[in-house]
C-alpha cells in the first residue's frame, strides 16, 4: 500500500515515518511538505535509511493520485487549510493535529485561538479515533491528543459503568518535552527544563474539550473536570494521575473496579492493567502500550487512577497507525510490535 505523510519534520511525523517504514502492509511512503526547502526536509532522514527519501511539494491532486491514504502530522491549523479537497473526494486522511477532533467550530476557535477552515458538517462526521473504543467508519479520522488519550483510557471503565461521581474528576497530567512540539520556546529550553518541573496551561489546555466531548458521549450528564498539565524533564512519556469519588457503597469496591477495567480491556492488545501496582513511564516509553493502575482509599472514598503512555506513540504516531490498521482491516498490531525501552 502506498501512503502519504504530510508534515514529517516534527517529532510525531518522524516517529510516524519510522513506524510506517516497518509496516508489513506499506510498500511505499511518499513525503509531502509545504516548506520551500525540500532538500533540507529530506536530509533529516539520511541517517535513518540507505534508501533515497524523496520529498515533494504539497499537491492535493497528486497525493490522491499516487497514494491510498494521507497522514497529516502538521501543526494545528494546517490540516484545516489543506484537507477539504481530500474530504470532498472521500479520500481517507488520518490527522494527528487537533483540527478534526472537536465537533463544534466555536469550541475549536476558543481553545486553539484560531478559526477553523473545516465545516461543521465535516467535523460532525469525523471519526474520533480512540481505537480501543471507536469503530472507524468515516474516511477522515481525528487522532486523539496525547493528554486526552491517557485520561480517557484511565476514566473510561469507571465513567461508562457509572462507578464514580461524574462531578468529582480531577486530572493531574504530566508529559515529556516532546509533547510541546519541536518549536523552541522559553518553557522547553534545556536550561529551563533540566532538573526542573513546571506547570503550564492550567485549565486552558486544548485537549480539555476533546476529553469532555468523549466523556459526554459515554455519560451525557458528565460534569466538568479539573485538569492540570505539567512539563517533565524527560524527552517522552506521559502520566495522567486521575482522582474521583467512588459512588459504589460496598465492601467489594476494589473487586468492582478491577472487574470494570478487566471487562473493558481484556481483549485489547495495547493495554496493560496492573494489579496492586502503579505504572511508571519505563513500562511504556518506546511502545504503543497504555499501562493503568489504581488505588482506592476507603477512608476518603477516592480512587486514584494512574494511566501512562508514550506521548509520541500511543499519544500520536502509534495510535495513528492503529487507526490506519483498523480502517483498512489490517491486524491491529501490524507495525506496532515495538517493546518498551525499559533502560
Regions found by a protein language model. Give the residues of each.
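N-terminal Rossmann-like NAD(P) cofactor-binding subdomain of oxidoreductases
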Residues: 1-193, 200, 296, 342-343
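Short glycine-rich or small-residue beta-strand-to-loop segments that form or flank ligand, phosphate
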Residues: 2-5, 142, 241-243, 305-308
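Conserved active-site and cofactor/substrate-binding residues in soluble primary-metabolism enzymes
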Residues: 11, 125, 146-153, 202-210, ...
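C-terminal substrate-binding/catalytic lobe of Rossmann-fold NAD(P)-dependent oxidoreductases
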Residues: 27-66, 167-168, 177-305
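Active-site catalytic microenvironments for nucleophilic, acid-base chemistry
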Residues: 157-161, 245, 323-330
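C-terminal helical cap and adjacent loop that interface with cofactors, partners, or active-site loops
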Residues: 282-343
Amino acid at each position: 500500500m502506498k501512503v502519504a505523510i504530510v508534515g514529517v519534520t516534527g517529532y510525531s511525523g518522524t516517529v510516524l515515518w519510522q513506524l510506517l517504514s516497518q509496516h508489513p502492509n506499506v510498500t511505499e511512503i511518499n513525503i509531502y511538505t509545504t516548506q520551500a526547502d525540500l532538500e533540507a526536509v529530506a536530509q533529516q532522514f539520511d541517517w535513518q535509511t540507505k534508501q533515497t527519501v524523496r520529498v515533494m511539494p504539497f499537491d492535493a491532486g497528486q497525493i490522491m493520485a499516487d497514494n491510498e491514504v494521507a497522514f497529516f502530522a502538521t501543526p494545528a491549523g494546517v490540516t484545516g487549510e489543506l484537507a477539504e479537497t481530500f474530504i470532498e473526494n472521500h479520500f481517507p486522511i488520518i490527522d494527528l493535529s487537533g483540527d478534526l477532533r472537536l465537533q463544534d467550530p466555536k469550541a475549536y476557535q476558543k481553545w486553539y485561538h484560531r478559526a477553523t477552515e473545516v465545516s461543521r458538517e465535516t467535523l460532525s462526521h469525523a471519526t474520533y479515533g480512540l481505537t480501543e473504543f471507536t469503530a472507524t467508519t468515516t474516511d477522515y479520522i481525528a487522532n486523539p491528543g496525547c493528554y486526552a488519550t491517557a485520561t480517557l483510557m484511565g476514566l473510561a471503565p469507571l465513567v461508562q459503568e457509572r462507578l464514580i461521581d461524574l462531578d468529582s474528576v480531577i486530572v493531574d497530567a504530566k508529559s515529556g518535552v516532546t509533547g510541546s512540539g519541536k518549536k523552541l520556546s522559553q518553557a522547553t529550553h534545556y536550561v529551563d527544563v533540566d532538573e526542573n518541573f513546571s506547570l503550564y496551561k492550567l485549565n486552558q489546555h486544548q485537549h480539555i474539550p476533546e476529553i469532555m466531548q468523549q466523556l459526554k458521549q459515554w455519560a451525557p450528564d458528565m460534569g466538568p473536570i479539573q485538569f492540570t498539565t505539567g512539563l517533565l524533564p524527560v524527552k517522552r512519556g506521559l502520566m495522567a494521575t486521575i482522582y474521583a469519588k467512588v459512588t459504589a457503597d460496598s465492601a467489594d469496591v476494589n473487586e468492582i473496579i478491577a472487574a470494570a477495567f478487566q471487562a473493558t480491556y481484556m481483549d485489547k492488545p495495547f493495554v496493560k492493567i496492573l494489579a496492586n501496582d502503579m505504572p511508571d513511564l519505563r513500562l511504556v516509553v518506546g511502545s504503543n502500550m497504555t499501562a493503568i493502575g489504581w488505588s482506592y482509599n476507603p477512608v476518603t472514598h477516592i480512587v486514584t487512577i494512574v494511566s501512562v503512555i508514550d506521548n509520541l506513540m500511543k499519544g500520536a504516531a502509534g495510535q495513528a497507525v492503529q487507526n490506519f490498521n483498523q480502517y483498512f482491516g489490517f491486524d491491529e498490531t501490524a507495525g506496532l510490535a515495538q517493546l518498551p525501552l525499559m533502560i
